[in-house]
Amino acid sequence: MKPSHLLWTIAAGISGLGAAWAHGGATGIVKERMDAMTEISRNVKLVGQMLKGNAAYDGVEIARAGQAIAAHAGDTMIKLFPEDSLNAPSEASPSIWNEWSQFSGYADSLRTSAQSLKGLAEQGADQKVVAAAFGKMAGTCKACHEAFRIKK
């Protein structure tokens, strides 16, 4: 094998290991919610790159990302947090269950704001309007993580 091919093979292997280690042996409902959060994060990053000008702006892709985020939010997200599901490597704070109405409110707000982002992108709304909707949605993620995610 050529040295350059070997380096690419090693790099690809390390990259794949990083993804596997990211969930550090999570199983069951903890893995399901970590996978859902990873999917949300991937879509948020995709839209963020477009709105920052680091990737070509594509309203169809933004609408698709909004739909994907909405699909993981609201009741779907809430069901991923049954009481006593703090098995390692969960990053969920026990305060979720003490402040359930606030937590579920964030989940519902994420769904609503992601649906709004999707709708605006589908309608061909001005990029600044889409960016404002994205900012609101991302702000919901940030607020929820600050309140209910254990800091690494």
Feature roles, as predicted:
Residues 8-16:
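Bacterial N-terminal signal peptides
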Residues 24-60, 65-152:
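Sequence context surrounding c-type heme c attachment/ligation sites in exported
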Residues 1-9:
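Bacterial N-terminal signal peptides that target proteins for export
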Residues 17-24:
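Sec/Tat signal peptide C-region and signal peptidase I cleavage site
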Residues 4, 17, 93-96:
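Acidic, low-complexity intrinsically disordered regions
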